[in-house]
Structures are given as C-alpha cells and as structure tokens.
UniProtKB/Swiss-Prot annotation:
Residues 362-369 are annotated as: G1. The lineage of its organism: Bacteria, Pseudomonadati, Campylobacterota, Epsilonproteobacteria, Campylobacterales. Residues 498-500 are annotated as: G5. Residues 408-411 are annotated as: G3. It is found in: Cytoplasm. It comes from the Bacteria. This is Translation initiation factor IF-2. Residues 387-391 are annotated as: G2. Residues 73-108 have a biased composition (Basic and acidic residues). One of its GO terms (molecular function) is GTP binding. Belongs to the TRAFAC class translation factor GTPase superfamily. Classic translation factor GTPase family. IF-2 subfamily.
Length: 854
C-alpha cells in the first residue's frame, strides 16, 4: 500500500494538519509539511498517540538514555560496529553499506551535531525496506529492529486501519502508563548533503523516525534543520546520477490517491409538502431522488428541463404519480399575505355606514366623463387630451348630506385592465350608453366586468337631448345581453340622462343612494386602514404618489403602510381637488405621498403597526415575485421549443416606454404587445412611470434601432441634447390612438414589401427565325398592351409556362424599338431561350413593390 500523507490523516481525524505535524514530531518522526508521507503502521501509531496520549510500544523499545559528551569518538565506534556487521552480509551488498556509512561519517560536522543537540532531543532511525532491517545509530550500539517494519501483504485502507485501531485503543486507555525519559537524552541527526555517491539509496525506501524526549512538553523548533531541510529535499531530487554513475534519486510520485465517494443511503419518502414555485433539484431533494432521475422522467413526459428550471403544478402532480409519492402543494404567498392577516384581525365592533363607491363605465365617447363633470360641477373631460379619458380618476361628491365616491374609467379598448380594476373595487357600477349609438364592444366588456365582480348595475342612457336618441333601441340591445329593465319586468334600473343639459342627473343620484342603502355598506373607522390603489405615478418633488379609496379603517398622516412591494409612511395626503387632508375615512378617496416606489394599480394597501413589519412584507413579496418571474422564463416544453426558435427569427422593434401613470403604462404595454404578426413584433426593452431620463437614452443607444416612446410626458432640454448626441429618437404623445398608429407604421416599414405583378402586354409567336451566333428570334404580333425592351416575360405554351426571362432584343422591321404597341408586328429575342415555337405566347409584365402595413 502506498504511503499516507499527513493531510489525509488530518482529514480522517478531523484535526488541522499543523496539529498532526506537532504530534508526529513529538514521536520523533521529523514531519515538516502536510504533504510528507509516512508508512501505514506509522499512521496508526500517530492515530493511537493522538487518541490515547500513550506512546506506542514500538517507540518505547527503541528509546534509551545516551550521553552525548564525545560525539566524534562515538562516531568512530559506530563505524567499527557497522563494519563488523557488514562483514557478516554477502559481498555484493558490502560496497553499498560502506558507501552509506561513509555518507554518515562525512556529513556529520560538529557544528550541526551541536545545533541538533541544543534544539532537539531523540534518536534517529534509518529504515531500509529492501533488507527488511533498520540501522539504528546510537551512542553505544547498533541494533536491528523490525518492530516498525511493514508487512506488504497486509495493507489496508486508512479508514480501515483507524477503525481497527479504535477497538484496541479502548483497551489501552484502561492500561495507561506514564513514560518519562531523561532530559539528557539527545539525538544526532544525520545530514545528507550534496554528494553524487548515493548509490541506490531512495527517498521512498528510507524514513526518518526521531524518538524525542517526552519529559519536555514544549520544545523549540529546530531552526537550522528547518532552514536546511527544504534545500536537502530539492537537492536530493535534483541530484540524479549522470552518465556513467550508479542509479540516482527516484522522484516521488505526485499522483494523489483517488477519492472515495461514500454513497449516502436515501430514505424512502411517502408524502411531502412542497411550494408551488420549486426547482427540479429542490423537488428531487424533497422526494429523496437524484436530480437525473427527475430530469429523465420529465424528458419522457415531453419536457426538456435542467436542474435549475421551475416545475409547474401539473408537472409536480405527474411526477408524484410516477414516483408514487403523496404531494401536498403549499402556497408560499400565504406567509406574507398581509391582506389575509388584516381580515383575520379585523374587529366587527363599532361599524358605521360608509360612503358608496360608484364606478362609471362604458364605450369611448359615450359621455362618461361629461356626466361626471356635470355631477361635480367641473370640467375634467376638457382637460383630457383628445377629449377622451386616459386615466382612472376618483372624485367625491355630496348629495343630500351624504358623500358619494365616483371612479371614472377610460372607455378605449386599450384600458381593459383599468375597467376590470374599477369593477373589482366598487360597490355599484353605472354603465353609460349613448342613446344615438347603442351598445358597442366596450359596453359589452364593461357589463361583463361588472357581472364578474358581482356588483349591482345601473344603466344610464346618455345624450337623451339629441334628436337621434333612441332609448328603446338601447333597451332592446341590452335585453339581448340579459340586462332587462325594470319596466320590462327585469331587475335593472334604466335612467335617461343628458350630461349636457343635466336632465335625469338627480334621479340617477337618488337611485344610487337607494341602491347603497339596500347594500348596507358598513366599515369600522377605528381599525387599521385598508385601501385600494386605483392609480399611481411619480411626481417631481413628491416622489411616488398613489390615488386610493379607503375601504375600511381610517388612514391618517404618519401611518405606516404596505402595498405589494411598496411600503413607507404617509407623509402627506390630499383630496381630488388638491386640498390637504389629515385623514381619509372609509369610502372616501384621496392621494397619498410617501411610498418607497410606485405601487401597482389595483394593489391592496394596508396600514401596519411598525415600519419593520411593512418592510418585511414588501421584501418577501419582492422575492416571491422575482422567483415567480424566473419560473415563467424557464418553463418550456418540446412543443413550445419550436415556437420559441421561430420567435427568435422575428424582426423586433426595440422600444423604451415611459408614461405618466401606472394604469396608462399597463394599457400601452398590452396594446403594443398585440402589434405583431409572423414577421415582426414590438420588443419592450424597458417600461416605467415618470419622465424620460438620461439613463433611458443610454439604454436606447445600447440597443440597435430602438426608439423612446413617451405618453403624457415631455423630455427636458438636457435629455433632448443627450438623445441628439447618441442618435436616439424620442417620440411623445398625449393620445393613445396616435401612438399606436405611429408604431404600426414603423412596424410596417420593417416588414418585407408586398410584391405584386402588373400585366404589360401579350404577343403571339407566328414565326421563329434562327440567327447564327445569336439564337432564335420570334416574329410576333402584339395582341394586348405593349411589349417593352428589357421587360420580364413568360413563354406560355398550351397554357403552361415553359420559360421565364427578359426581353433581350426588340425590333420593328430592322430598327430597334423600346416598345411595340398592340396591333403591330415585331421581332423579339428572349435572353437564354432557344425553345420558341410557333403558336406560343409571350406575356410581358413588371413587378410592383408595395409597402406592407400591420
């Protein structure tokens, strides 16, 4: 068995290598570094000494008490005894032993011997494996010892020897004996220096064992030996015998023994609870299977995954069935569901009636904002670009001493998410339908949103002051959607109104309050506040701003709040008119300042006790959303792989999108992502709320052919200059129609042009003339249109195209002609065609390119 290195012993025992070196040196082994190697039985001796603090028997027998007064004379006696022992050995080995003895004599100067005596005490043993004996240099005599010899036939692994040694050590601990040596004991270390007459001495064949003085607990390190030992090793390896000399020093093998990997026994798992978002390797660890097993199962099921990919619920359930394990899927979002915690803690005492929240919905340009303007006695619609609402607004009105909160939503098709959000946080929905226009697509969508939210619906038929108003048509169309008016035996209130004259407005508000009384809307103003964010944005000098409607509790200035990934303290609040407020009560709306970032529109805002609690909720939510986003990006099946490869070949228009509010940004992103076909698409590199910054310009410049789109915002002078220097185009809009139309035009320019054919004329071949060195010339009669020189033609025979090419020559009699019109004869030469026949037709045409549009 190969020798064992010190660092392997240290690793096996769980000790540091330095500690093992110290213990080995206490046994006189002369170990210098962790890479030094010892014989297996020496390793066992070190192990026993470390575990029991008892000197092994093999070392006790060799220890004697020499008196080192006359080292030179003793060396002479040693040589005499060595010579006597050599006489008994065969003649072949006599020369080698003499050379070894000469080395011992010549390389032991007085200075080194005295330094060794001062620094280190002990005996030196030189072992020779070849003769299976040890030559021991002592003060008085040399004895042969085979106590520490190696039995080559019984070589065990390091771990086996140590495990066997543990059993013997338990017995030895009971029979501990103290060993005390004389302080006068000393060791003279032989110094092998730079000589060429080493013979066949090998570093692998000899080991040095120093038996120290154990009475000295802390011995000084031999400085002289430490200095010379590295030199000795380097010289010994380098001094290989040259040409004509005997064998040199053998180089020690550098190969490390192969590491043995222990196989861990995996316990069988019958049931396990895992989260929805889990990676492949995490799932494998949970069920006690190897990652490769899980990946191979998924591959057989048609999913190409790596160990870092996320698994969806379907894949988890299928894998559970395959492995025969019961899986309980848990939702990690429950840990930071602050809304659930709030509802559990809500006390139903002290409930009072709150203001109703009304959402006005309907098709674009049906008069929703104008109706609200008349109610509020304001002109919001005139302030909107293009006269269409592109933001969600929340307003407060008072009727008969009672407050009503109105939410105005956009009617444009791009703002579907806004309408859905408005329906989900409202108490009553008013659907506005123009009496002269009837039910439109967004009207149907608004009704579906309201039905999905399960809230009462009131129909307001607007523009009743117009001559073309037809309320019966509106009622009929809505009846087809199962919205039956009360007068027709249904359960829905229909009110005819005019936002221009104010007709029917009072009746509408009366019905709203009556419906609110039926709903019995209650809230506890004394509890922690709970609100819904209907819009959010970034304002210069104020930071993140959110428009909210409080549903329960009272939100005051200084309250600590959390909304999704955003949190903070409410620094200031104001109403829809900009008037500062100190608190917002249930059912009321307002604008708050103080969130750490722009909160997502539609997020629930909760007031909490401490800032630490809010931060923890927000951070956990952020990490969860990040993991969820990563899981979406890594899930792919074999069927989807082809689609992804195809998508990679699409031309893309890189866009950086900035908007004034979160709701508009969502609507724009959704609309732009729909602008695509099999050839082109819009690639939104970055989107955000707020003005266009220099970092946006830098990002756009890093992407080839990218543009910056701004909605309801304007870039500053510095940003414009930066964009000009970088060659980045900035386009700003205040009407969503214009933005979408321009992007469509840009995408159309990126598409391959549409190539169409325009027929020019047709000629009948009546004679074929073979011209030497030129080829065939067709004598033709033009039957339709004109034949142009250089035009593209098709040669048609019996209705089948037999050749396509260009007109190489066109003659009228003997003169060249640019074109020949209908009814005239001409000679036509077709480039590369020598198979023209009488009766064939020549069809002339040109290709026209048209710009594609999306």
């Amino acid at each position: 068995m190969a020798k064992i290195r010190i660092h392997e012993i240290a690793k096996e025992l769980g000790y540091d290598s330095k500690e093992i070196i110290e213990k080995a040196n206490e046994l006189g082994l002369g170990i210098k570094t962790a890479s030094n190697a010892v014989e297996p039985d020496i390793a066992v001796a070190i192990y026993e000494y470390i575990q029991t603090r008892e000197i092994p028997e093999a070392f006790k027998k060799n220890i004697k008490t020499p008196t080192a007064k006359k080292p030179k004379k003793e060396n002479a006696k040693d040589q005499e005894k060595l010579n006597e022992s050599e006489k008994k050995e065969p003649k072949k080995e006599e020369s080698k032993e003499q050379e070894k003895q000469e080395i011992i004599d010549t390389h032991k100067p007085q200075s080194l011997a005295s330094a060794t005596l001062a620094k280190r005490r002990g005996l030196v043993i030189v072992k020779k494996k070849k003769d299976e004996e040890e030559i021991q240099v002592k003060k008085e005599e040399i004895k042969n010892s085979n106590d520490i010899s190696i039995n080559n036939e019984e070589r065990l692994s390091l771990k086996t020897m140590f495990s066997n040694a543990d059993e013997s050590l338990k017995k030895k601990k009971k029979e501990k004996k103290s060993f005390v040596a004389s302080k006068k004991e000393s060791t003279e270390k032989m110094n092998f220096l730079d000589e060429h007459d080493f013979g066949d001495i090998s570093l692998d064949d000899e080991d040095e064992v120093v038996l120290p003085d154990f009475s000295v607990k802390e011995q000084e390190k031999p400085q002289n030996i430490n200095k010379k030992q590295p030199n000795f090793i380097r010289q010994a390896v380098g001094n290989s015998a040259g040409f004509g000399l005997e064998g040199g020093i053998q180089r020690r093998s550098r190969k490390k023994p192969p590491k043995k990997i222990e196989k861990k026994e995996v316990e069988e798992v019958s049931s396990v609870s895992i989260s929805k978002e889990i990676r492949v390797y995490e799932f494998a660890d949970k069920i006690g299977k190897s990652t490769s097993e899980v990946i191979s199962k998924l591959f057989m099921l048609g999913m190409m995954t790596t160990k870092n990919d996320f698994l969806d619920e379907d894949a988890i359930e299928i894998l559970a069935a395959e492995f025969g394990i019961e899986i309980n899927i848990i939702n990690e979002a429950d840990e930071f569901d602050y809304v659930k915690d709030y509802e559990e803690e809500t006390d139903e005492k002290d409930l009072v009636t709150r203001a109703p929240v009304i959402t006005i919905m309907g098709h674009v340009d049906h008069g929703k904002t104008s109706l609200l303007d008349y109610i509020r006695k304001s002109r919001v619609a005139s302030g909107e670009a293009g006269g269409i609402t592109q933001h969600v607004g929340a307003y407060m009105v008072e009727k008969n001493g009672r407050k009503i909160t109105f939410i105005d939503t956009p009617g444009h098709e791009a703002f579907t998410a806004m309408r859905a959000r408005g329906a989900s946080i409202t108490d009553i929905v008013i659907i506005v339908v123009a009496a002269d226009d009837g039910v439109k697509p967004q009207t149907k969508e608004a009704i579906n949103h309201a039905k999905a939210a399960g809230v009462p619906i009131i129909i307001a038929i607007n523009k009743m002051d117009k001559e073309a108003a037809n309320p019966d048509m509106v009622k009929t169309q809505l009846a087809e959607m199962e919205i039956m008016p009360v007068e027709w035996g249904g359960s829905y209130e229909f009110v005819g109104v005019s936002a221009k004259t104010g007709m029917g407005i009072e009746d509408l508000l009366e019905i709203v309050l009556l419906q609110a009384d039926i709903l019995e809307l209650k809230a506890n103003p004394k509890s922690f506040a709970k609100a819904s964010i209907i819009e959010s944005s970034v304002q210069k000098g104020r930071g993140a701003v959110a428009t909210i409607i409080v549903q329960n509790g009272t939100l005051a200035v200084g309250s600590t709040v959390v909304a999704g990934e955003a949190y903070g303290k409410v620094r200031a609040m104001s109403d829809d008119q900009g008037k500062a407020l100190k608190e917002i009560k249930p059912g009321e709306c307002g604008v708050i300042v103080g969130l750490s970032e722009v909160a997502d529109a539609g997020e629930i805002l909760i007031a909490v006790k401490t800032d630490k609690e809010a931060r923890e909720y927000a951070n956990k939510r952020h990490e969860y959303n990040r993991q969820k986003e990563l899981s979406k990006s890594t899930k792919v099946s074999i069927d989807e792989l082809g689609a992804k490869i195809k998508e990679g070949n699409l031309k893309a228009l890189p866009v950086i999108l900035k908007a004034d509010v979160q709701g508009s940004l969502e609507a724009l992103k959704a609309s732009l992502e729909k602008l695509r076909n099999d050839e082109i698409k819009v690639n939104i590199i970055y989107s955000g709320v707020g003005g266009i910054t220099q970092s946006d310009i830098e990002l756009a410049s890093a992407s080839e052919n990218s543009i910056v789109l701004g909605f309801n915002i304007r870039p500053t002078g510095e940003v414009k200059e930066r964009a000009k220097d970088k060659g980045v185009e900035i386009k700003t809009y205040n009407v969503i129609y214009n933005l979408l139309d321009d992007v469509k035009a840009l995408l159309g320019g990126m598409m391959s042009p549409i190539i169409s054919e325009e027929q020019l004329g047709q000629a009948e071949i009546r004679q074929v003339i073979n011209v030497p060195k030129i080829g065939q010339i067709a004598g033709c009669m033009v039957t339709e249109g004109v034949i142009n020189r250089g035009a593209k033609i098709r040669l048609i025979r019996d209705g089948v195209v037999v050749y396509e090419g260009n007109v190489s020559s066109l003659k009228r009699f003997k003169d060249d002609a640019k074109e020949v019109a209908k009814g005239y004869e001409c000679g036509v030469g077709i480039e590369g065609c020598d198979d023209m026949r009488v009766g064939d037709y020549i069809e002339s045409y040109k290709e026209v390119e048209e710009q594609a549009s999306l």
